[in-house]
Structures are given as structure tokens and as C-alpha cells.
Amino acid sequence: MTDFTTVRCPELGDSYRAARLENGLTVLCCERPDRRGIYAVLAAGIGSATRDYLCGGRRRTLPAGTAHYLEHKLFAGKRGDAFELFAETGANANAYTSYDRTCYVFGANEQTERSLGILLDFVSDPYFTRANVDKERGIITEEMNMYLDSPDVRLLNEVLRMLYRVHPVRDEIVGTSASLAAITPELLYEGYHAFYRPANMVLAVAGRITAERVAELCRKHYRPALRGEAGRVLPAEEPDGVVCTRAVGSMAVSRRQFCIGFKERPIAGDRLRTELIFDLLCELICGESTDFYNELYDSGLINGSFFSDGFAGSGYFCTLFGGESDEPDRVLALLQERLAALRREGIDPDRLTEAIRSAWGDMVVSLDSNADIATALAYSSLKGYRIYDTFEALRTITADELQQTLLQSFDADRCCLYILNPIERS
């Protein structure tokens, strides 16, 4: 019998149950008997930026794209194709790789327990052969070409390459033709046994199922036969400066696009609080309710595509601003002026209160569906905090904290601008 701890959220009147199984797997379950079906996320703490690591006293390196390759191959095992089995249960399944995690997910209204068993079976039982790995290489190469045709992907990749000289976050998630050619069954097994260990994974489930039943299904279906030791990621020795400050490219887009990046210091302390502080700063700098945003919008310098965002992971952190604009250099100049003015004038406590209230409301709305909750549970667990901790952090963040962060961040010497022109302008 597994002892589950109940984690409650007074702000939402909601709760979830958490436990670590005997094998080390973290299980989080938000029981919602009034909701139909379930949504499950099985997440591993390995992403495209998981590259250099120690295992068994040896330094090892995974080629770019290995985490994504593993994601593809784990859903094609000895039992066949996982998606075909999910189709038999009526489940809608998917898998994806980001810079710091790999997730296997499904949503189902019928045969939910069978679907959960399928998920656990496939991820805990890798099957890599020379033939199936070589076959997958062609499939991933086609996906890579489609992936690189996305303007959003192009903008992000180019900015990260401009900001980071060494850190593997500068490399594409899917890898390159050269790195894919270096991936072998033996290398995939090494990566799997180093990082697909129960202690480095979390299963989050939300919907009409009990935590006890989830634990029972884990014991029945999740039995990875691991070899060797866990991998320990080695930090990249990233220099402070940026690689370059301005670059221009082109592709088939209807209007010029841009992305501004500020290279920040990697988060060393409370990750949740730091990310929230930067989110609030971005809202106060150029949120849709600010005079600055509306001046840019009314003058035609930006449109509704404009965004700001923090982008953080192990050993990297940057803030990004971008969208469509015919004059991206002008937008950057005005943004620098806005930052300088805000540093001089200080953070307005009343505006901060409004921003916190808005973030609070967004958090409440984001925890509605089974998919929203399971995804948030898994992500927060891998980052080292609980989803409901967000409310306490928002309640205690101060204007002084934001002001100090503002004075130490958004450094013009650690900033870059990438411009993506329509092909006909190049």
C-alpha cells in the first residue's frame, strides 16, 4: 500500500495526492470523480540540452537530438507501435521533447486504465536495434526539415545561438543531419539507462481515477530493467557575453519578424520566484495594458503578434521580446529607453498589484482541464516545486524585489536582435 500525501490549495479549493513509489517514481494524482476520463503525463528529466554527463566515473556525451530520438523510439517497441494500441482504446496520445524534459501523454474517456498501462509499458521497455534506429533516422530527418520551416522555431534557434556560445541550448532540439548520423542503438541505450530512471521521472494523472489505482498500475506495468548508474549532467562553462548582437536572415514569411534576447544569469536560487518576478517585470515593461505597448501598437511598430517571455532551464536563462515589425531596430531602441525610464522611476506598487492580480487569475484559469492540471503537476515537479506554491509566491513578491531585479537585468551589453525578412527583401 502506498502512502500518499494530500497537497491542498485553499485558493482553488482543490488538491492532489503525491507519493514516491518504492522504485523512486514520483506519482501525482488529482482525483476528479466529477470529470469524465483522465489525462496522464509521464515526464523524464532529459531534454535536448542534456548532453554532457558523468556515469560510472566516465564523462559521456549525447549527440544533439538524442533525447528527441529516444522519444521517437520509446513509442515503437517490441509490442509494436504505441499509437496503434492507443487508437484501439480511443486514447489521444502524443510525445514531445523540449530543452529540459521529455513527455509522453495521453487523454482518454474510455478504457482509461488500459491506456495508462500502455503508456507505462512502452516507456519502461526500450527496444533499439540497428534496423529500427536506422529506419527512424529518415523519419526524424523529414520531421527536422518541417520543424526548421517554422518561423517561430527559426527565430528562437537563431537568438539562442546569438546568446549562447557553449551551452547546448543553442542546438536544435531535433539535432542536425550530422548528429543524427552518430546516434546508434548502443548510444540510445546508454542515454536511456542514465536518465530514464524512476527517480528522474514523474507520472502526473488528473481525472476520474484514484491515486491508489494509479500506483497499482505503476507496479504492474512500470518495471524498467535498468543497467548501470544514473547520469549526472555536467554544467556547461558558458561565458558571460553574447556571441553577436545583431543578425539578419530570411525565409518565406509574409512580414518581417524579429526577436530581441537578453542573456540573464542562470537561476541559482528559488526558480519559481525568479521566473514569476521576470514574468511580472515583462508585464510591467510592455504588457498590453501599458502605455508603452499601446504607443508601439498605435504607431504601427508592433501588432498583436508581439510577445515577451522568460526562458529558463539548467544553466541558462534569457528574456525574449518579439513579433512582427517593419522597424525592429526602432522597437529595440524604444525598449531600451523604456527600461532606462523604469529603472529611474522605480516600480509602481499599484501597477504591480494589478499585474499580480492578473497573474493570479491566469493561474486559476490554467488549472481547469484534466490536461492543464496533469501537465502543470509534471512540469512543476521536474522543476522542484509544487504547482500551488505559485499562489504563495505571488502573495509575497514585493516591488523592491522587482526593482532590484530590474537594476541587475536586461543588460544592453548582453542583448541581441535577430531579424527575419521575407525572402523577397533579401
Model segments located where?
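His/Glu-rich zincin catalytic helix
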Residues: 1-82, 189-295, 414-426
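M16 family metallopeptidases and their MPP-like homologs
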Residues: 30, 35-53, 65, 81-123, ...
